[in-house]
C-alpha cells in the first residue's frame, strides 16, 4: 500500500495536487473544485483518441435532440470540432458536479466586461437547458467559467475587438519588434485580428485553458501570422 501511495503522489504531482495526511482520518487531496474540474476535463479529453469517444459523439450528434449544438450555432459562435468536443465535456462535468452537490465557487475577477458577449448569452441558454433537463441551477461562478471557456476555445472570426490597454500595448510592441527586425510593416487591417488573438491568448494563460484549435478555413483570422 505504501508503494502504491508513493506512485499515486507522483502521478498527482503532475497536476500540482498534493496529499494531506490526517491522523485517524486517512488522507485528503489539497485541491479546490475548479482544479477538480480541470483534472476531470484532462481525463475525459484523453478519450478523444479512442473510438469509444467518437462513437458517443456521433450518437449524440445523430439524435434529434441537438439543442446544445443549435444554441452555439444560433449565437453565431465559430468553434472547431475538437473544441466543441471539449466544450461538451466541460458542460457535462458542470452538470454532473452540480447534481452531486459540488457547485463551482471560484470568483472570476473583472468578469462584468464579458456579460455583453455572445458567449455569455450562449451560456445563459445552456443554463436554461441544464435547468430544464437536469433541474440544475448554474450559479454565477458556473456561468463565468463556461463563458470564459467559450471565449478561449472559440474562433476570433467575426468578432469585434474591444480596446483594452494591456492588449493594445502588447500588440504595438509586437508590431514594432517585427518592423525593427525585418523592416516589414504590418498593415493596420491586421491590428484588430492580432489584438483579438493576443487577448484570448492572455485569457487562456490566466484561466489555465488549453490551446485553441483554429478553424482551418479561417486560419488567417484565427492565427494572423
Q: Model-flagged regions — what are they?
A:
Residues 2-225:
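A cross-family "folded-core" feature that marks the main globular domain of proteins
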Amino acid at each position: 500500500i505504501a508503494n502504491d501511495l508513493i506512485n499515486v503522489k507522483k502521478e498527482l504531482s503532475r497536476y500540482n495536487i498534493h496529499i494531506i495526511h490526517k491522523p485517524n482520518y486517512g488522507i485528503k487531496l489539497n485541491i479546490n473544485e475548479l482544479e477538480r474540474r480541470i483534472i476531470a476535463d484532462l481525463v475525459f479529453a484523453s478519450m478523444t483518441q479512442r473510438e469509444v469517444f467518437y462513437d458517443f459523439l456521433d450518437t449524440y450528434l445523430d439524435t434529434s435532440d441537438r439543442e446544445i449544438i443549435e444554441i452555439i450555432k444560433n449565437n453565431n459562435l465559430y468553434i472547431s470540432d475538437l473544441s466543441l468536443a471539449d466544450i461538451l465535456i466541460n458542460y457535462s462535468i458542470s452538470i454532473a458536479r452540480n447534481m452531486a452537490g459540488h457547485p463551482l465557487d471560484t470568483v472570476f475577477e473583472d468578469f462584468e466586461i464579458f456579460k455583453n458577449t455572445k458567449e455569455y448569452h450562449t451560456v445563459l441558454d445552456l443554463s436554461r437547458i441544464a435547468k430544464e433537463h437536469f433541474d440544475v441551477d448554474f450559479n454565477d461562478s458556473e456561468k463565468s467559467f463556461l463563458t470564459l471557456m467559450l471565449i478561449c476555445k472559440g474562433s476570433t472570426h467575426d468578432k469585434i475587438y474591444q480596446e483594452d490597454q494591456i492588449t493594445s500595448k502588447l500588440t504595438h510592441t509586437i508590431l514594432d519588434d517585427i518592423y525593427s527586425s525585418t523592416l516589414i510593416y504590418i498593415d493596420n487591417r491586421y491590428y484588430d485580428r492580432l489584438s483579438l488573438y493576443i487577448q484570448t491568448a492572455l485569457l487562456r494563460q490566466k484561466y489555465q485553458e488549453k490551446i485553441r484549435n483554429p478553424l482551418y478555413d479561417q486560419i488567417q483570422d484565427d492565427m494572423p501570422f
